[in-house]
UniProtKB/Swiss-Prot annotation:
Residues 1-22 form a transit peptide. GO terms for cellular component: mitochondrion. Keywords: Mitochondrion, Transit peptide. This is Altered inheritance of mitochondria protein 18, mitochondrial. Its main location: mitochondrion. InterPro entries: Chalcone_isomerase (IPR016087), Chalcone_isomerase_3-sand (IPR016088), Chalcone_isomerase_sf (IPR036298). PANTHER family: FATTY-ACID-BINDING PROTEIN 2.
Amino acid sequence: MIRALARGATIPRSFHYIQYYQKRNLLTHGLKKKHIPPYKTILALGAGAFISGLFMLQKDSITNDAGPIENSESSVEVDKSVSPFTVVLSPPETLLTTKYTLLGFGPRSVTFLGFKVYALGIYVANEDLPLIPKILNPTYLCKAFLDTDSAKSHSENVGAALKDATKSRVLVGSLIDGGVRFMAKITPIRNTDFNHLKDGLVKSILNHPECQKNQEAVSRGLQELKNAFTRKGSVPKNDDLIIELQANGSLQLSYRSRKQNECMMLGRVDEPLIGKFLFSQYLGGDKPLSPPTRETFAQKVKTLV
């Protein structure tokens, strides 16, 4: 080290320590110096490990953003920011009137802002699951749509129709008219409030193409919907807004707070067009509110028919 300084070389103090430590270890353990990797090799190995770690983190991030993941038979992960969605929801842990099973799920994204707003789950009452194949039977499908592909199976034709912009609205409407009870679970991915949730529902319903033909009924129903939001204030992310479409077409709204571990009734909407238009927007049209939800719903219904 003295000779190096005498030549005017600038050597980092940390490197002197490494040299001194290696020399001392050689004497202690009786090793030859050639068995110790040069410091450049150590740095290269460290850099390689660091890059590998970054790659693994990136890979994990890509996996987490890939879309809904089925964790097990009892729940599905819709988005990593919120709790997994339970496949079966029923009283008394909720204020639902009966037991429901999850058929479709996915995030609701605001495209022009580029972020996810909430996780959505579409459920059907367990007692009404047998109604789906009865309503969407081959005879009905052929009468409703003359262009049914004879080369495909019945389930394939149903799946294709549920993904079609026009046919999907017809099928969802037929299920609702046939008495199938639906339920939507909305779980905010970001902190929000009841006013934003209410305004989002109103906007979605007003965007339904049949609204203009039913202005009086829709106007009356939207006022009922606004009145149903009896609770005000903030809604933390991961809480649940539960919208149950009952057999008579009315909507029952309830709220579940995870922090307080309680459910509370919000209100109800008696005008049947409001519920029908809302669930049609979730599952039908050329721009459904959550395309992944419609996709998973269509895949599940295919297995039922």
